[in-house]
Amino acid sequence: VHGILGTDNSKRDIWSGVIAGVKWAMLIGLLTALVSVSIGVVYGVISAYVGGWKDSLMQRIFEIFISVPMLPVLIVMSAVFKPNIWVMIGIMCIFYWVGPVKTVRSMGLQIKEETYIEASRALGASNTRIIFKHMVPLLIPYAFASMALNVPGAIVVEATLSLLGLGDPNIVTWGQILQDAHNGGAMLSGMWWWVVPPGLAIAFMGMTFAFVGFAMDKILNPKLKTR
């Protein structure tokens, strides 16, 4: 056994793999969270602003997406198509955008009744300008909190798919290291250093962003401070 965390059965340094996995974990988590939350915030604001039958239609579409289980779809898509990290991120974005919609819509319904929104409409401001100039900026703090809470989910989903052998084999992720450890019989051979470090890395990264998200949520929602 050599190196800080030892080597696997192919003499690859585990520490180097764990460090390389940080880059991909951050990319997968942050990119998925950024794209999905941005879509969800804009969708929720538009739904709240337009109202009427358009709002009802948008909410029915939202309910269809939120009722579809993401992980089975990801497993099927990864099995049908060649495993690719960008396809995986794209599919996660398709399902993750529904997360903030309900909360954003309820906040948007309150914002659109504000006096300055009515004044902007009376002065002839377009709906697009009102939505993106006056409403969306007020939801940016909530969007950041939502992003922080979405990052752990994206990292865990990628690790799950990689552990099942459906991840991108061309990149080094923590899930891919665990999959290699499983195939290499690490647990049967007692090679705990091949399994524990990437597992702890996933847990640590997930907890870090989760705590950041909870802290931001408490700041944005004073009612949570009393709990």
Language-model features: locations:
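Alpha-helical transmembrane segments of integral membrane proteins
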Residues: T7-R227
